[in-house]
A protein has these predicted regions:
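Class I SAM-dependent methyltransferase Rossmann-like catalytic core
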Residues: 46-88
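Substrate-binding/catalytic lobe of Class I Rossmann-like enzymes that use SAM or dcSAM, i.e.
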Residues: 218, 224-306, 314-320
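Surface-exposed recognition segments
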Residues: 606-611, 636-660, 733-809
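Conserved hydrophobic ligand-interaction patch in extracellular adhesion modules
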Residues: 584, 620, 641, 691-692, ...
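Disulfide-stabilized, aromatic/cysteine-rich ligand-recognition loop
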Residues: 341-371, 378-379, 390-395, 399, ...
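Short, contiguous alpha-helical
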Residues: 361-410, 447-499, 618, 632, ...
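A short glycine-rich, aromatic-capped structural motif
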Residues: 376, 385, 573-701
C-alpha cells in the first residue's frame, strides 16, 4: 500500500481520529516541510494530516463535531459519561491522570469530576502533554473552568511531544501510577506496526507503573462510516481541501491551491478496516517541490482513520507487551485499559488474594469432583511459575499443585492425567508461604525480561478462568451453608442474606461495559431492564406469573414458546410462555480465528480459522430461559422425575446426584425456593427474571419438555452475527455462558499448543460440550467471540444459561 503516517515524534492527530486532542504545531518550520516533501515523493502521494489544522481548519473541525453524521466525537463522549465511575474505579488512589494531546478538555473533565467525587479535589492531579503552548494554555483554562474545585497546583502542563512529555511526567512523579489517557481514537492515524512501536515507546518512556486508557473507534457498516467523513453539508470536504491549500502554501505554490482544483473522495477500505480521505487533481500542478508534479487525475491521500475490531485491539496490546485489563464499549466506540503484563499479573494476584481472604476454611470441598479450595491457591502459583519460567527448577510442591481434576461425571474413576492426590493437603500457612516465594521468583523473571508476552498471557488467562470457576465453588459453599443454617433455624431469614442486587449490578456492569443492549438500546441485566427487579409470585417462592423487561405482566402458562396459545408440544404438556421467537435467516459463518502466535494470543482450540460454512435458517428465543420458567418445569411439573425428557446417561447421573433442581437452588420442604450465588442467597421470587444456570443435560431436558432444542455452536455464531446491530437476541454473549449442543472437538487443522498441549486435547472426549459468551464473573480479557469454553454436559455447577431453539418449519 502506502506509507501515509508521519513519524511518531512529529505525530499530529487528525479528524479521522476525532480531534479531541491536538498535537498541533506550526508546520512551516524546516523539519515539517521536509516531512511534507517526503510525503509528496511517495506513490501514491500523501499530505501529513497536521496540515489540516491551521486556524481555518481548526474552526472547520469544530463544525464537524457538531454534525449529525459525525458520530465519533459524540460516541466517545457518551461512552465516558456512561462509564466514568467504572473507569475511575480502575484508577488507583494517588495516580496522576496524564492526557496525550490537549483540546477543549470537555471529555477529560468527565473523568476528572468522577475522580474528584471519589477522592476529593485535593487528591486529584492532572498533567497535560502537547507540543502546542497555545493548546496547553487553552486546556489549562478549560480544566480550571470545568473543574473549579481543582487548585492550580493540581494542574500541570508539559510542552513536548508525547514520548518526551511522558519522560518528563515520570521524572516529576517517579513513583506514582501514571494513568495515560489517549482520547479521540488518535491511534487510528497510525498503521498497525506504527501503533505497536508507539506503545512500546510509551512503556519505555513512562515505565512499568503505567496504565493506558485507549479510545478506539470500532469498525462498522460502510454507510455509517462514509456519511461520517462525507457529510451532506460538505464541511468535511472543505476541511480536507483547506488542508491541501495549507500544504501547497507551505511549499510555495499557493497560487495553485484553489479548492475548486480538487475533487474529494472518501474510500472505505474493508481489507485494512480504515476510512481514506483523498483529493483528486482536476488539473496539473507543476513544480510542487524538488521537480515533483501533481498530474491531472492523480490521487493524493490527505488522511486515514483506522477502525478497530476487538481482535485488532487485543493484537495491538499483545504485540506491545500490554494486557487488556478492562474494556468499556458501546455499539460504536470502545475504551480499553492497557497495563504491562507484569502489572497485569500483580493485579490478578490481588484479585486472587481477595477471593481467598474471604474463604474461611480452605479445606472445604463444596464440589466433590473438584479439589478443596486450598489446592487452587497453590495451583495458580504453580501453573504461573511453570509457564512463565518453563526452564526453571521444579520443586515437589510445584508438581503437586501443577494440575487439577475434571473426572468423568458418569464414572469419576476415569480422569485425565494429574498428580497423585496426597493423603493430606499442606496446611494453609504452608501454601501461603509457597505462593509468596513463587510470586517473588516470577516477578524477578519479569524484571529480567525473560518472561515472554505469550507465556504471561497463558498464565493470566488461566488464573482468570480459575477465579471464575472458584466462584462456582463459592456458590456451592453458600448453598451448603444456607441449608445447614436453615436446618438449624426456624427463622431462615435471620440467618442468611437475601440481597441479589450485587449480582445484578455485576451483570449489568459487564453487559453495559461490553455494549449489550435491548432493542430499545437500554442496558439489560439477565432479562431485567435497567437493573430493576420485578418480584411477583406467592410468598413461598412459587411463581404464579412474571413481569417481562417491558413491564408487561403475564401468567406463566398464558401462552407458549412456539407462539401458538392453542397448541401443545409433542409430549402433551403445555409449552411455556416466553419472549418471541426470532427467525435467523440462513447464511455463512466462519468458526475459529487465524492467529500468528508471535502477533496475538488465542488458545489452541480457537484456531485456525475455518472455511466459511452454511447454516440453515432456524428460530431462537429472544432471551434465555428464566428462573421462573425453569421453576415451572423443575418444581411444578416435576420434570426431574419424568424419564422421557432425559437421555439415559444423563438420567443415571441425575439419580446418583439425588438433586431434583439446579445445583444453585434450594427447594425446601415448605415450598420455599432459594437461588445461591457466591456469598449471598435470594428468594427465587426476587430473581425470577434472571436466566437460570444449569447443566447441558438439564437444558436439554427442559427443551425436550418444551418442544425445542439447544442450539449448536454454528447456530450461536450465526445468531450473534445476525443480531450484531439490531440486538434482537438478548443476553446472548453475557449474563451467563450459553450452552451449545456441539461436542468440544478440534477445529480442522488444529495443532496443540506446545506450552500447554493438554489444555484442549484431554477434553476432546465426547463428554465435554462447547459453551460460548461469558458470565458476570468472566474477566474482560476472556470475552471474545472466538473463545471456546467447555464443560461436561452433566456438570451442573457452571454459570451457563440456554434458550429454546427450533428448526424453521
Amino acid at each position: 500500500m502506502y506509507d501515509s503516517t508521519p513519524a511518531i515524534s512529529t505525530f499530529v492527530t487528525g479528524q479521522g481520529a476525532d480531534r479531541n486532542s491536538s498535537q498541533e504545531t506550526r508546520l512551516e518550520n524546516a523539519s515539517d516541510v521536509a516531512d511534507l516533501k517526503a510525503g509528496l515523493l511517495l506513490s501514491p502521494k500523501h499530505i501529513p494530516c497536521g496540515y489540516l489544522y491551521d486556524d481555518k481548519g481548526s474552526q472547520l473541525y469544530e463544525e464537524i463535531t457538531k454534525l449529525d453524521e459525525y458520530y465519533p466525537f459524540k460516541a466517545e463522549k457518551d461512552l465516558l459519561n456512561q462509564h466514568a465511575a467504572e473507569v475511575v474505579n480502575s484508577i488507583p488512589a494517588g495516580s496522576i491522570l496524564v492526557e496525550l494531546g490537549c483540546g477543549t478538555a470537555e471529555k477529560t473533565s468527565v473523568l476528572l469530576h468522577a475522580l474528584i467525587a471519589r477522592d476529593g479535589a485535593s487528591n486529584v492531579h492532572f498533567l497535560g502533554i502537547d507540543v502546542s503552548m497555545e493548546a496547553l494554555y487553552m486546556a489549562r483554562t478549560n480544566v480550571m473552568k470545568q473543574c473549579p474545585q481543582l487548585s492550580s497546583k493540581s494542574i500541570e502542563m508539559v510542552c513536548a511531544d508525547y514520548l518526551e512529555g511522558l519522560k518528563q511526567a515520570r521524572a516529576r512523579h517517579p513513583t506514582a501510577m501514571l494513568c495515560v489517557l489517549w482520547l479521540g481514537s488518535s491511534v487510528g492515524n497510525l498503521k498497525p506496526h506504527e501503533a505497536v512501536g508507539f506503545f512500546q515507546s510509551v512503556q519505555e518512556s513512562s515505565g512499568p507503573n503505567t496504565q493506558i486508557f485507549l479510545c478506539t473507534d470500532l469498525w462498522k457498516d460502510a454507510k455509517t462510516l462514509h456519511a461520517a467523513y462525507c457529510d451532506s453539508q460538505g464541511v468535511t470536504e472543505a476541511f480536507i481541501k483547506n488542508g491541501m491549500t495549507h500544504a501547497l502554501h507551505a511549499v510555495g505554490v499557493g497560487a495553485q491551491a484553489d479548492p475548486a482544483c480538487w475533487l474529494y473522495d472518501v474510500v472505505i477500505n474493508p481489507v485494512d478496516r480504515r476510512v481514506e480521505m483523498w483529493l483528486v487533481a482536476n488539473e496539473d500542478v507543476k513544480g510542487v517541490c524538488d521537480s515533483v508534479d501533481i498530474h491531472k487525475g492523480e490521487r493524493i491521500l490527505m488522511e486515514m482513520s483506522r477502525k478497530f475490531t476487538l481482535k485488532d485491539i487485543r493484537q495491538l496490546a499483545f504485540q506491545s507487551n500490554f494486557y487488556v485489563q478492562d474494556t468499556w464499549r458501546n455499539a460504536k466506540y470502545s475504551m480499553q485499559m492497557f497495563v504491562s503484563t507484569s502489572e497485569a499479573m500483580q493485579r490478578c494476584w490481588k484479585a486472587t488474594d481477595a477471593l481467598f481472604d474471604g474463604i474461611g476454611d480452605w479445606a472445604i470441598q463444596p464440589i466433590d469432583v473438584r479439589h478443596p479450595f486450598g489446592f487452587y491457591y497453590g495451583h495458580l502459583a504453580s501453573f504461573a511459575k511453570l509457564k512463565t519460567m518453563p526452564r526453571g527448577e521444579q520443586s515437589h510442591m510445584d508438581e503437586m499443585y501443577s494440575r487439577g481434576i475434571d473426572p468423568n461425571m458418569a464414572d469419576p474413576t476415569k480422569c485425565h492425567r494429574h498428580p497423585d492426590v496426597p493423603p493430606e493437603w499442606p496446611a494453609k500457612p504452608q501454601v501461603q508461604d509457597y505462593v509468596q516465594k513463587v510470586r517473588m521468583h516470577i516477578l524477578g523473571a519479569f524484571a529480567s525480561g525473560s518472561v515472554t508476552t505469550r507465556d504471561a498471557y497463558i498464565a493470566l488467562e488461566h488464573e482468570w478462568m480459575h477465579l471464575e470457576t472458584l466462584a462456582y465453588m463459592l456458590a456451592q459453599e453458600q448453598r451448603l451453608s444456607f441449608e445447614k443454617s436453615s436446618a438449624n433455624s426456624n427463622n431462615v431469614q435471620s440467618s442468611v442474606s437475601f440481597d441479589s442486587s450485587s449480582d445484578d449490578e455485576m451483570s449489568a456492569k459487564r453487559e453495559r461495559s461490553h455494549g449489550h443492549a435491548d432493542s430499545q438500546g437500554n442496558g439489560v441485566t439477565n432479562g431485567v431492564a435497567n437493573g430493576n427487579k420485578h418480584a411477583n409470585g406467592n410468598s413461598n417462592g412459587g411463581l404464579n406469573g412474571h413481569t417481562y423487561a417491558n413491564g408487561v405482566s403475564h401468567s406463566i402458562s398464558d401462552s407458549h414458546i412456539n407462539g401458538n396459545a392453542n397448541s401443545r408440544s409433542s409430549n402433551g404438556h403445555m409449552p411455556l410462555q416466553s419472549a418471541s421467537m426470532i427467525q435467523i435467516p440462513a447464511g455463512d459463518i466462519t468458526l475459529g480465528i487465524d492467529t500468528d502466535p508471535s502477533k496475538n494470543f488465542a488458545w489452541d482450540n480457537e484456531c485456525p480459522q475455518q472455511t466459511p460454512q452454511h447454516v440453515s435458517s432456524f428460530q431462537i428465543a429472544s432471551r434465555p430461559i428464566s428462573n421462573a420458567e425453569y421453576y415451572k418445569f423443575a418444581v411444578e411439573c416435576r420434570g426431574y422425575e419424568q424419564e422421557e425428557y432425559w437421555k439415559a446417561e444423563d438420567l443415571a447421573c441425575l439419580r446418583k446426584a439425588t438433586k431434583l433442581c439446579p445445583a444453585t437452588w434450594t427447594v425446601q420442604a415448605d415450598g420455599q425456593v432459594f437461588v445461591h450465588r457466591p456469598g449471598k442467597s435470594a428468594l427465587l421470587a426476587s430473581v425470577m427474571q434472571q436466566a437460570v444456570w444449569v447443566s447441558l443435560a438439564e437444558a436439554q431436558a427442559f427443551c425436550e419438555w418444551a418442544g425445542g432444542r439447544v442450539m449448536t455452536e454454528e447456530e450461536y455464531e450465526r445468531a450473534a452475527e445476525h443480531t450484531r446491530y439490531n440486538n434482537s437476541v438478548l443476553d446472548l454473549e453475557h449474563g451467563g455462558w450459553e450452552w451449545t449442543s456441539t461436542p468440544f472437538a478440534p477445529l480442522k487443522g488444529f495443532e496443540a499448543m506446545s506450552e500447554y498441549p493438554e489444555y484442549s486435547t484431554d477434553f476432546f472426549d465426547g463428554c465435554h460440550y462447547v459453551v460460548k459468551g461469558s458470565s458476570p464473573y468472566t474477566h474482560a480479557s476472556l470475552i471474545r467471540r472466538s473463545f471456546r469454553n467447555y464443560y461436561q454436559k452433566e456438570y451442573p455447577y457452571v454459570f451457563a444459561k440456554f434458550r429454546i431453539c427450533k428448526d424453521t418449519e
